[in-house]
Design a protein with these regions (language model features):
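Acidic, low-complexity cytosolic segments
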Residues: 6, 10-170
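Intrinsic-disorder-associated, low-complexity terminal segments enriched in Asp/Asn/His/Tyr and depleted
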Residues: 1-4
Length: 170
C-alpha cells in the first residue's frame, strides 16, 4: 500500500518518464538517465531550438511537443532538468517531480550545481534510481531517501573511492 501522494496518483494514470537530461547554460548535456529505453540525445534538439527562440532562459516553454515525445523541463540554479515523456502526462506532476529532484540534490550536496552533481555522480544515479521506479515517481521524500542512500561525507567519499563501494544503506 502506497501513501496517498501526488506520486502515487501517477500509478493510476499509467504514464512514465522515459529519460532525464541535465543541461548547463552552455547547452552541454552533462548527465542523462534512462528508465525504460534509451532516448537519443538528439531529442534535446527540440529543446535547444525553443531555447534559442526564448528571450532568456526563464522564457523557455516548460512543455515542448515533438513528433514522438513531450519534453517537460524546469530551470533551477543555472541548470535545465529536461524530462522525456512518450505519452500525455499532466505536466504539473512532472514539473513537481523535477523540482523534487533539484531539491534532493540541494539537500544532499549543499547545492544543486553542475560541479556538485559531477562530484557526486554515483549518488546522483542512486537517487534517481530510488526516486523513479521504471519511470514512475516512487521515493521522493528526503527523509526516506536518506534511509536508503546515505548522504555524502568527506570520510565516506574517501572510503568509497578506496574500497569502490557505494552509498546504498544496509
Amino acid at each position: 500500500h502506497f501513501p496517498d501522494t501526488w506520486a502515487t496518483q501517477w500509478f493510476g494514470v499509467g504514464k512514465m518518464i522515459h529519460s532525464l537530461f541535465l543541461i548547463n547554460c552552455s547547452g552541454d548535456i552533462f548527465l542523462e538517465k534512462h528508465w525504460k529505453s534509451v532516448v537519443s540525445q538528439s531529442v534535446c534538439d527540440y529543446f535547444f531550438e525553443a531555447q534559442e527562440k526564448a528571450a532568456d532562459v526563464e522564457n523557455v516553454p516548460p512543455v515542448i511537443s515533438t513528433p514522438h515525445h513531450y519534453l517537460i523541463s524546469i530551470y533551477r540554479d543555472k541548470l535545465f532538468f529536461v524530462s522525456v515523456i512518450q505519452t500525455e502526462v499532466p505536466p504539473l506532476f512532472v514539473i513537481e517531480f523535477l523540482h523534487r529532484v533539484a531539491d534532493t540534490f540541494q539537500d544532499y550536496f549543499g547545492e544543486c550545481s553542475e560541479a556538485a552533481i559531477k562530484d557526486n555522480v554515483v549518488i546522483v544515479y542512486e537517487l534517481l534510481e530510488e526516486m523513479l521506479d521504471n519511470g514512475f515517481p516512487l521515493a521522493t521524500e528526503s527523509n526516506i531517501l536518506k534511509e536508503l542512500i546515505k548522504p555524502p561525507t568527506i570520510l565516506r567519499s574517501v572510503v568509497n573511492s578506496i574500497t569502490g563501494s557505494s552509498n546504498v544503506g544496509d
